[in-house]
Amino acid sequence: MLSLLPDLQGKKLLDLGCGTGGHLQLYLERNAERVVGTDLSVKMLEQAEQELQKCGQFSGRFSLYQLPMEKLSELPESDFDVITSSFAFHYIEDFPTLLAMIANKLKSNGTLVFSQEHPITTCHKEGERWEKNEKKQQVAYRLNHYRDEGLRERNWFQQPFKTYHRTTATIINDLIAAGFQIEQMAEPMLAEQPQWHDEFKDLRHRPPLLFIKARKVINLTK
């Protein structure tokens, strides 16, 4: 995602779902003037503050807020040059409303850069995800329920959670409707990361993530 960012010199950035602040630190290292992070987890925000405070030169240049993305309008800061989010938007039910709030927090010509689970992953509802050969090796990824947008009930090591599926077309059209112009998209494949082949060999057949860079070009009514 960092490769999609514009020059950060002197810029003000907001990272939605900042976690422990890894991206915030990278932005400051790239000479951003000020960074703001939001997250749901108090523990992650506490760790983010500890890590950022370790770097004395960052003092006074960052703020952290416990705030869900769905309540972004309540953030007391605005006029950001760049807003980012990593691997989080597929947890949002009302994507158009989130984009409207993001647009309101951005300056004119401000940039939004985000990643999320790829729609060919979020679409899955039931059955096996993989077609396997006689040796039980994964040879093809099954695509199903792609047009059936909405809630997906999922489990990760027996921990239930919810995500929301949107087609690529819906994601793009929602961005356009919110006043954004698409500047770049990326679908990194494992083939481009040979050092991960053994550990993540199941990702050779599909892009796991979708990355989008968009610029605010229309000021809609707030």
Where are these regions (language model features)?
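A short acidic, Gly/Pro-enriched loop at the edge of an enzyme's catalytic core
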Residues: E74-I83
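Class I SAM-dependent methyltransferase SAM/SAH-binding core
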Residues: L14-L16, T20-L72
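Conserved class I S-adenosyl-L-methionine
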Residues: V113-E149
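Conserved alpha-helix/loop element of class I SAM-dependent methyltransferases that forms part
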Residues: M1-K11, L26
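A short glycine-rich, Lys/Arg-flanked "PGG" loop and its adjoining helix->strand segment in the class I
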Residues: P96-T111
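Short catalytic micro-motifs in class I SAM-dependent methyltransferases
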Residues: F87-H90
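Acceptor-substrate binding/catalytic loop of class I
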Residues: I120-H124, N155-A169
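Short alpha-helix
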Residues: K162-M185
